[in-house]
Amino acid sequence: MAPWSGFWAASRPALAAAAAGGTPVVVKMDNPNWSISEIDADGGEFLAGGRRRGRGKNAKQITWVLLLKAHRAAGCLAWLASAAVALGAAARRRVAAGRTDDADAETPAPRSRLYAFIRASLLLSVFLLAVELAAHANGRGRVLAASVDSFHSSWVRFRAAYVAPPLQLLADACVVLFLVQSADRLVQCLGCLYIHLNRIKPKPISSPAAAAAALPDLEDPDAGDYYPMVLVQIPMCNEKEVYQQSIAAVCNLDWPRSNILVQVLDDSDDPITQSLIKEEVEKWRQNGARIVYRHRVLREGYKAGNLKSAMSCSYVKDYEYVAIFDADFQPYPDFLKRTVPHFKDNEELGLVQARWSFVNKDENLLTRLQNINLCFHFEVEQQVNGIFINFFGFNGTAGVWRIKALEDSGGWMERTTVEDMDIAVRAHLNGWKFVFLNDVECQCELPESYEAYRKQQHRWHSGPMQLFRLCLPDIIRCKIAFWKKANLIFLFFLLRKLILPFYSFTLFCIILPMTMFIPEAELPDWVVCYIPALMSFLNILPAPKSFPFIIPYLLFENTMSVTKFNAMISGLFQLGSAYEWVVTKKSGRSSEGDLIALAPKELKQQKILDLTAIKEQSMLKQSSPRNEAKKKYNRIYKKELALSLLLLTAAARSLLSKQGIHFYFLMFQGLSFLLVGLDLIGEDVK
């Protein structure tokens, strides 16, 4: 018994620590002279082999292996249990707090209409499920009242004659739209594949290698012909978490100081934030940067008004190009060197757009799912449109405009909340070409809370519908090629901005659960499962490290369809919430190494130390009492909760009719809506 007692004495403290919630341990046995395959072999053969080898293989050694496996299984179960407990505790906090999305900035009228429709659908589905359960129980021999039996028979005849045909017609129409949109996405993916296989890449007319060989030193006064005058704008509004990082990054752009001017366009209404930004600008000005601070007294037009006001300065006429960076963007020092050369000897080029990269893409599940979406947007949509038709929607930041293109297109307009798409469409109608550089990245942040992401998506999907209403007459009258008009109207606006959110919400959140209660109208399995799975697979290809999240991504995209549908309707019919502009909340995430890397080699050590201090100051500000006064809360989202109950009710009905694929889809989609409705995805504010 000595070996067993020795083993137990050695492993008992570690096992006790693991049982108490400590770090899982692995028990190591010295000189194991057997394998798992030997243990799984026939018992007699195993013992015989043991005798032949003269080894003491016995039941105690097998017990050790089973103990290790049991310990590993217990650790897994303990992790699942702790996760479930934490999830339940978070849900209880949300319900106890009682904070709903009624406090959001959206206008109540359109939101309440959609919520009333979803709630009515939920009540109807619960009633129909009760009727079906009563009929099901009656079929098993239970006694039902004659009135209930008569009602069920009348309902079956009524739904077959009057409800199922229009529902099936609507379902078929949505399926057609779904297939058209899927075909469009497949064509874009094939275009991206063609670009990668043939290594197609936008190149300046003067090759970068030749230009680099010919470029003199940056401090050479004769270098002006190679380094045109560039204006850099940083619009911001109450974004004290990130202003230091963006100003530091822009002030360290590798460009002759005499040929660059930085405009910090501060629309903050908080005096403390204004003072902090002024101090930061003054610090960099004293260090030799050409930088100015601008603050508007009349803050009209949101970001578009801010940019329009800045372009009205008298000194702008001395500059040829303007680079725009939002407050959370941190361009690398060589950004201008890799973008501006594309304008040289290319007078038709109006915009050079870089792609985004994200400093917090692994922060939580919400940021991981956003990263999948945006990787597909840049890698496939922007790159394919830029290569093949020289047009895409300007992303509003991390881009360089030819100032002449902005002026010829009417400049910045305040008529919509998507001023970036507005100027891009007008520039395209005026014949300007765009270039997208997939290999030039600019770091930024993703929204970490569902509330911030939801408001951002509402603005991004309501604005295009506003713009479509305003631009449609101009597109029809414009003297451009017919195929360009067709691309703008049918692909850019209708298919990708209107049809996509419409069928996503209508087909998967309303029609599909209704077909469970009206079985005469059907949706085939390939619509519910196979095609969406294929589209999710294509979407996740540009971010291969995110493959473990393919199922959460599919469910989350359908969950977001309610927000996108509501935004699309608001923009299309000019409802109040379509005109709201809410600045996306920032966290100020950036590594110290990233900030130090922003500094050019010729900067003194003191400036590098200043950059290092930015991170420390940012952390101190985030923990200061002044910031603690402004509290953040997790909310309960009523539309998402109502949809979760609707889908789970439909899942229960599909279980009665033994529709396997429909049941699993409805159940998991309902749980997804439940998690989002309780704000259990993204940042957890305690």
Curated annotation (Swiss-Prot):
Active-site positions on this chain: 267, 420
Function: Probable beta-1,4-glucan synthase rather involved in the synthesis of the xyloglucan backbone than cellulose. Seems to work simultaneously with xyloglucan 6-xylosyltransferase. Xyloglucan is a noncellulosic polysaccharides of plant cell wall and consists of a glucan backbone substituted by xylose, galactose and fucose.
Keyword Cell inner membrane attributed: no
Protein family membership: Belongs to the glycosyltransferase 2 family. Plant cellulose synthase-like C subfamily.
InterPro entries for this protein: Glyco_trans_2-like, Nucleotide-diphossugar_trans
Keywords: Cell wall biogenesis/degradation, Glycosyltransferase, Golgi apparatus, Membrane, Transferase, Transmembrane, Transmembrane helix
Gene that encodes the chain: CSLC10
Annotated compartments: Golgi apparatus membrane
Superkingdom of origin: Eukaryota
Segments passing through the bilayer: 114-134, 160-180, 498-518, 523-543, 640-656, 661-681
Major site of localization recorded for this protein: Golgi
Official protein name in the record: Putative xyloglucan glycosyltransferase 10
